[in-house]
Curated annotation (Swiss-Prot):
The gene is MKK1c. ATP binds at residues 76-84, 99. Belongs to the protein kinase superfamily. STE Ser/Thr protein kinase family. MAP kinase kinase subfamily. The lineage of its organism: Eukaryota, Viridiplantae, Streptophyta, Embryophyta, Bryophyta. The active site is at 194 (proton acceptor). Gene3D superfamilies: Phosphorylase Kinase, domain 1 (3.30.200.20), Transferase(Phosphotransferase) domain 1 (1.10.510.10). GO terms for cellular component: cytoplasm. This is Mitogen-activated protein kinase kinase 1c.
Amino acid sequence: MSRRVRRGGLRVAVPKQETPVSKFLTASGTFQDDDIKLNHTGLRVVSSEPNLPTQTQSSSPDGQLSIADLELVRFLGKGAGGTVQLVRHKWTNVNYALKAIQMNINETVRKQIVQELKINQVTHQQCPYIVECFHSFYHNGVISMILEYMDRGSLSDIIKQQKQIPEPYLAVIASQVLKGLEYLHQVRHIIHRDIKPSNLLINHKGEVKISDFGVSAVLVHSLAQRDTFVGTCTYMSPERLQGRSYAYDSDLWSLGLTLLECALGTFPYKPAGMEEGWQNFFILMECIVNQPPAAASPDKFSPEFCSFIESCIRKCPSERPSTTDLLKHPFLQKYNEEEYHLSKIL
């Protein structure tokens, strides 16, 4: 079940409340959790994490962007704890994606939302390969994020429409995603931890951007590692599935699987006779951990593409190249981005 909250003429649909949010509210009605403070005017981060600003106040472009100035166009989708709607700014006719999260949700989802808020804040206007969050605020039990609208959907949508994405366009996609990951890894020391087709969004200009930072992690320094188990299991690297420590290179495994899925039109790992159900889910996980890595067939793909995928999907994390090294890979140099502009397949 869900309820609808009317906000300045805009009806925001949010999931049904499950747990009290009152313990996260200050006397003034500000939502406070961990090191963020969020109210109707915006977001403030007071962070002890070395790669996040000590104090930051979110602001809308030119002070013009507010919930009262947005009108609903249509419903886009829903996920854990929230809904996403396409909205239009009444005065500029610019479209945005409005993500609304009811904060009376379970602790795991709440922590993911808080983490997403912090990372959205630190990456604001910093990297053209990351979906931008223009404004976020809290009001009446709902956290709202006004996000850049990517009007061609996700790579997952493209696969459903096209079945397979031709290799030259995959090179263009890989280049843009790697530039986004290079920024996250080397500048912000962030592991995304959930790279997959549905989290890579595209717009009509052919721009590919990374989205959804709910399960991302900030590392203390470039050599640090994590050992928590979050993200979409089917795209996890073997070391993560085994519960071992992991670092930035786990994102590259996920990217390799994602690109191979786009090339094949189906998920690369699919044991014979696989059917839906938990038993077969664990068989799939065992296959990823214990069997040789998935690979691009040299009979169907160029040597450069096969080499690129092999570089990403190496079971030993230390053998995977960095984002910087992969950006120099012959596969990305083989195709001209202008000639294979993504708008041609959208």
